[in-house]
Regions:
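NAD-dependent ADP-ribosyltransferases
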Residues: 1
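Sec-dependent N-terminal signal peptides
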Residues: 4-15
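Subset of outer-membrane beta-barrel
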Residues: 20-323
Length: 323
């Protein structure tokens, strides 16, 4: 019985952790993961990306997360208006019970220019998804073989919406700002019958700008604020981007920077853009009280994004801050 209670306590802690959505330190490596309205905020006709996160590597079985996403332009009209769709798949798991969640999401975004020049664009996005969380009871050691779990898997739907604004003041200054709400329907994620444990709504505000300070170097400040239930997160920092070569689809650049997750971690970022490819790397170092248990080891992230281009000038969007 004692062992059974210990396992249930572990699951309860997992549910509490699940009460906070999957998120990444690379806040804009693949922005549709953050806000469905960002679908379509790129140059080209489509985009494919993936991000992998390994968290708390100092423990025996660390928390691992993988996200894969794809986007494509459905329609583009006059004045840079258009419609874009996206699909995202998440998977994360950890622990000896292989507790994890798998989810799939479909999004659609419409973007409308606010002026004739197309230097100010408003985008609205909607997203729907389905998730399944569960664990492997065969990995549990029970003192009483007759004891068993009544619920091993929970399934639920997810709804999200967002709005984003892109603004280009001049050739060397542009920015984007977005707001999104996830888990609008607050699904029940409890493993216990006759119990309601809801996945709380997550509110996110994000801003990224790019200032061309020198001929080949830009400064990119960023701010991300998120709130979910009793939890809040504030990330702020800046990158420096060095344009090694600028020749249309053959653009080559390096980007490095630091960000701070307030009262929690320092995040080091490194990105390389080579033509249509973007390769990303980041590392979290704990600075909170958790650093005692984790040995200061936070999380490693690696990712890749590929942008599909058509070669036609008619399909080229205004130059957004690259991710």
């Amino acid at each position: 019985m004692k062992r059974w209670m210990t396992i249930w306590a572990t699951l309860l802690l997992a549910v509490v952790g699940q009460g906070q959505d999957i998120h990444f330190s690379q806040v804009d490596a693949d922005p549709v993961l953050l806000n469905p309205a960002y679908s379509g905020f790129y140059e080209g006709v489509g985009r494919f990306g993936m991000v992998y996160r390994n968290q708390w590597a100092s423990v025996s079985i660390p928390y691992q997360t993988l996200a894969v996403s794809g986007e494509m332009a459905l329609w583009r009209g006059a004045g840079r208006k258009g419609l874009s769709v996206g699909m995202t798949v998440f998977n994360d798991h950890a622990g000896t019970l292989h507790y994890g969640t798998t989810s799939g999401h479909l999004s659609i975004a419409y973007y409308q220019p606010l002026n004739r020049a197309g230097t100010s664009i408003l985008s609205v996005g909607l997203e729907g998804g389905f998730a399944q969380s569960g664990f492997d009871p065969s990995q549990a050691e029970m003192e009483d073989p007759s004891e068993s779990f009544t619920v091993q898997t929970v399934r639920y739907g997810l709804l999200a919406a967002g709005v984003a604004w892109y603004w280009q003041a001049m050739s060397d200054l542009h920015a984007k700002v977005g707001f999104s709400v996830r888990n609008i329907n607050r699904p029940n994620i409890s493993y216990m019958q006759l119990d309601d444990t809801h996945l709380e709504r997550r509110y996110s505000m994000f801003a990224r700008a790019e200032f061309r300070k020198w001929q080949s170097i830009s400064l990119l400040p960023v701010v991300l604020w998120q709130h979910q239930g009793k939890h809040s997160e504030l990330v702020y920092g800046a990158d420096l981007k060095w344009y090694i070569e600028e020749d249309g689809a053959r653009e080559v650049s390096l980007r490095a920077g630091l960000a701070f997750r307030h009262a929690d971690a320092i995040i080091a970022n490194l990105m390389m853009e080579y033509g249509a490819f973007l390769f990303t790397f980041s590392y979290d170092a704990n600075v909170s009280g958790l650093s005692v248990a984790s040995g200061g080891i936070g999380a490693f992230e690696g990712g890749m994004v590929y942008r599909f281009t058509s070669g036609s000038k008619k399909t080229k969007r205004i130059k957004c801050p690259q991710y």
